[in-house]
């Protein structure tokens, strides 16, 4: 079929798509590129060429193909914008790993500008700005991204930039970040953690209470924050109950992006490949550490060990933190008449008792 001019296009399409399906990426790239050059209207050639280059981790080449496809209206503009942001970030990540920081920073900043809602680009750009001795530029970039899609990894990056800052400066910078998305859940959790870090538990409860009121099944992250707060209120029994609940509470996908022993968004080339289409086509992040049930970073105050193997409510495995708590004092079970599981409204009642003056 390839030798017959009338059937060449059909044969090339079948061959290229078969090569892509069987993992012969160089062959798929060669056949689809040739077809796309011969027939600029061949949408299949664009799709196959782009997919093969992405699968082969050829980020720069894939971006060039994407630009051509956008010009020929083979891909919608918003999808092209998001895909381009992922491709630039993937290439920036590769350059960063090779120690080529200047071009990596340039690409990451462009990616964050293209898609401020793409947190991995902002986190990488902020990290590279910090390495280049430009913390103010890093802060501004995170603030812009926070206004579009607040993410716990960006909060962590921002706090890293504030390390060693005076209290007044820290307050001013955190306030500036919070104003970018004052009603966002991540903003409230960031402020609650900061209050805990300062030892102002009443203010921390004031921020946490509405979040806990809003859900009947708080996540493991919220349970751990509640446990820390109870501990600081000198309520060890309630703290242990929250630790127990944390072991079986639902995980937060975004929180799993923070590796307790490494970088946030520590993606492999295969992860970047998936992101090109997940974020590029739908605007959704992937969460490899969530999928693999990797250890979680503990939210809140100070450096703490990760929570190993946190599990969903259907699984009975308990975290090390819970086992340590139970070793100190047995925890009453819900069928004990003197005990009941803690709910969000219980915290609200505790908060009210802390904030309201005693009645005479």
Region annotations inferred by a language model:
Residues 19, 53, 95, 128-129, ...:
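Residue at a conserved register position within TPR or TPR-like alpha-solenoid repeats
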Residues 11, 45, 79, 121, ...:
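TPR alpha-solenoid repeat register
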Residues 9, 13-17, 83-85, 89-93, ...:
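Alpha-helical adaptor scaffolds
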Residues 32, 66, 101, 108, ...:
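Inward-facing hydrophobic residues that define packing positions of alpha-helical scaffold repeats
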Residues 37-38, 43, 50-74, 135-153, ...:
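TPR/TPR-like (Sel1-like) alpha-helical repeat modules
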Residues 22, 39, 56, 98, ...:
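Structural motif corresponding to the intra-repeat A-B loop/turn of tetratricopeptide repeats
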Residues 2-5, 33-40, 70-79, 108-116, ...:
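Solenoid-like repeat scaffolds
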């Amino acid at each position: 079929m390839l030798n017959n001019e009338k059937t060449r296009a059909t044969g090339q399409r079948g061959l290229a798509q078969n090569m892509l399906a069987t993992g012969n990426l160089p062959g798929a790239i060669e056949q689809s590129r040739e077809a796309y050059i011969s027939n600029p209207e061949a949408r299949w050639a664009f799709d196959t060429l782009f997919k093969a280059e992405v699968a082969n981790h050829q980020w720069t080449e894939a971006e060039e193909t994407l630009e051509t496809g956008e010009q020929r209206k083979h891909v919608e503009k918003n999808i092209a914008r998001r895909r381009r942001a992922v491709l630039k970030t993937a290439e920036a990540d590769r350059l960063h790993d090779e120690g080529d920081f200047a071009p990596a920073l340039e690409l990451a900043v462009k990616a964050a500008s293209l898609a401020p809602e793409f947190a991995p680009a902002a986190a990488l750009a902020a990290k590279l700005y910090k390495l280049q001795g430009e913390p103010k530029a890093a802060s501004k970039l995170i603030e812009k991204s926070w206004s579009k899609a607040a993410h716990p990894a960006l909060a962590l990056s921002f706090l890293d930039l504030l390390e060693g800052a005076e209290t007044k400066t820290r307050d001013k910078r955190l306030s500036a970040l919070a104003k970018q998305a004052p009603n966002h859940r991540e903003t409230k959790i960031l402020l609650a953690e900061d209050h805990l870090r300062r030892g102002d538990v009443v203010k921390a409860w004031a921020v946490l209470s509405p979040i806990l009121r809003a859900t009947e099944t708080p996540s493991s992250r919220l349970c751990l924050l509640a446990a820390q707060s109870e501990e600081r209120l000198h309520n060890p029994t309630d703290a242990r109950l929250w630790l127990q609940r944390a072991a079986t509470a639902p995980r937060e996908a975004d929180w799993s992006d923070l590796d307790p022993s490494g970088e946030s968004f520590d993606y492999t080339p295969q992860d970047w490949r998936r992101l090109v289409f997940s974020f590029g086509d739908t605007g959704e992040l992937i969460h490899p550490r969530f999928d693999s049930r990797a250890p979680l970073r503990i939210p809140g105050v100070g450096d703490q060990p990760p929570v190993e193997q946190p599990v969903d409510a259907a699984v009975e495995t308990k975290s090390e933190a819970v086992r340590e708590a139970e070793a100190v004092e047995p925890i009453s079970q819900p069928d004990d008449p003197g005990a009941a599981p803690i709910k969000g409204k219980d915290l609200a009642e505790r908060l009210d008792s802390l904030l309201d003056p005693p009645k005479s």
